[in-house]
Amino acid sequence: MASVSKQATAIIDLDAIRHNFEQVKQRAPGSKVMAVVKADAYGHGASKVAQVLEAADAFGVARVSEAVKLRESGIGQPICLLEGVNDPEELNLASIYELQVVLHNWEQLELLAARGARRHVWVKVNTGMGRLGFSLEETPSVLQKLGHQGLLGLMTHLADAGDKRSVKTGQQIARITALADSLNVPGSAVLSIANSGGVLAQHHYP
């Protein structure tokens, strides 16, 4: 019996992507929006999606190579390396292409400190996701070593934001807000908290 193989086809509606982005902006009018386009915009085509989302305040990617491609395609907005940098070569490219860097661990912090590269840095805080980031207890020491010059802000990731019944989201928000209030961070530093679920389901906008 002959097998029939059908090729899967993805139809990308860029107008729909733009519409979705505009919905987020409307629901969070006082906040800046970072459009995450890692993994080739989840298979949608990072460069094309970034061009369509020209109103985004910044773009987030996982790897340096993704950021370089965006820059070389003409994207001028800030580009954030969500997984940070892990060796001197990546750090050098981050400097050349003016990329924002997220710090998750002490090894990354030591890399930046050893090379005096402390500009355009986010500090990731693990408030309950349990995946990446410094603990709440570690963060004050991280900021002390990093210094406040060039600190963009604190970042966390909501674990259950899409579940309106979850109490964990409120707990995570309370933890990072209390942490930020307790730290002597510059007024220019911001909090990056809400993913899409946080905006659409939880109505939380930072």
Per-segment meaning from a language model:
Residues 102-104:
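Ordered, amphipathic secondary-structure segments that act as subunit-interaction surfaces
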Residues 4-6, 39-51, 110, 114-120, ...:
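Active-site loop/helix belt of alpha/beta enzymes
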Residues 1-100, 118:
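A charged N-terminal "starter" segment
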